[in-house]
Amino acid sequence: MEGLTVGRIVHFVIREWDANRINRRRTNSESIKERMAHNEWNLGAQAHIGTSVEEGEEYPMIIVKVLDKERGVVRGQVFLDGNDVYWVEAIYSHQDEPLPGSWHWVERE
């Protein structure tokens, strides 16, 4: 696949499974405050805070490893609307009709 290199930014389409994992690990400031008041928050723990994620939403992803250049299979870090990222592996390209769990090139205007 022409142009497929480490460091390239593409779009990743969120699957329901991804959305559930991301949303489950996220918290908010009120929850943290409550847990800290009762010594239920581990000192030094990183809180994942951000907007809710849904299946079909697209987020920028930086390619961190090309597994199969010919078939467009990659691993990447998805940049979410929050203070966290999400690692995906063995993700295939689907350029014609972006499907959940696939990546595609960023559209140019």
Model-derived features: where do they sit?
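Short, charged beta-turn/beta-strand-edge "cap" motif at the junction between a beta-strand
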Residues: 1-2, 9, 13-20
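Short intrinsically disordered terminal tails
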Residues: 1-4, 108-109
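Residue-level signal for functionally critical sites in structured catalytic/ligand-binding pockets
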Residues: 5-8, 27
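Glycine-aromatic-enriched surface loops/turns that form tight recognition elements
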Residues: 25-35, 42-44, 49, 93-101, ...
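Intrinsically disordered, low-complexity, charged/polar segments
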Residues: 52-59, 64-109
